[in-house]
Design a protein with these regions (language model features):
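PAS and PAS-like sensory modules
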Residues: 65-67
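Conserved GNAT-fold acetyl-CoA-binding loop/helix
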Residues: 32-55
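Short loop/turn motifs at secondary-structure junctions and domain boundaries
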Residues: 58-63
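Acyl-donor (CoA/ACP) binding surface of acyl/acetyltransferases
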Residues: 1-35, 52, 69-184
Length: 184
């Protein structure tokens, strides 16, 4: 697949690339933002490893994770991904997103997630897309609802590897049929 550039009214989503490390670490290294993430990048070295791994993934023939940076007015303000590795047969994708705290509350996550959802159904051979968030993260749950997803499980749990903290997890889903109906 050719590396896609996704455009919205205000944002550009482009594949993660070498050279993005500093701007990504501004949010990926912020514990206030990443406290609800599986693997926050506590150190700049971890962010560099993340960028290298995801830049290489874009070059891979067997690509399973489509990691984008979210660019607003020339600045990387967040990231989002569609990940197929959560199922053994790669039959569905899981979406995720993160926004620099200085850019929250402006609809950027919803705008990026909607573009990512469109990319996923338009380019990947799947019929379901999931997203999950910590039950204490109403903003992400709101994004899921805004892009047309439906809550399918509110009884899940997640344990964060770096802290050992266990919390509730919400899982939302949208099917290809639902997405197509929503688009008209």
């Amino acid at each position: 697949m050719e590396k896609p550039i996704l455009k919205t009214k205000r944002l550009t989503l482009r594949p993660v690339q070498l050279g993005d490390e500093k701007e990504i670490h501004e949010y990926a290294g912020d514990k206030e933002i990443t406290m609800m993430f599986w693997l926050p990048n506590d150190t700049f070295e971890e962010t560099c490893d993340f960028v290298k791994r995801n830049a290489e993934e874009w070059e891979s023939d067997g690509q399973l994770d489509y990691e984008f940076v979210i660019v607003y007015e020339g600045k990387i303000i967040g990231g989002c991904d569609a990940d197929l590795s959560h199922s053994e047969d790669h039959s569905y994708a899981c979406l995720g997103w993160i926004i620099n705290k200085n850019y929250r509350g402006q609809g950027f996550a919803s705008e990026a997630a909607a573009a990512l959802l469109d990319f996923t159904f338009e380019n990947l051979s799947i019929d379901k897309v999931y997203a999950q968030c910590d039950c204490k993260n109403p903003a992400s749950f709101g994004v899921m609802k805004k892009i047309g997803m439906t809550l399918v499980d509110d009884k899940g749990t997640r344990t964060y590897p770096k802290t050992g903290i266990t919390s509730g997890e919400l899982t939302c889903l949208i099917t290809r049929d639902e997405w197509e109906k929503k688009r008209g």
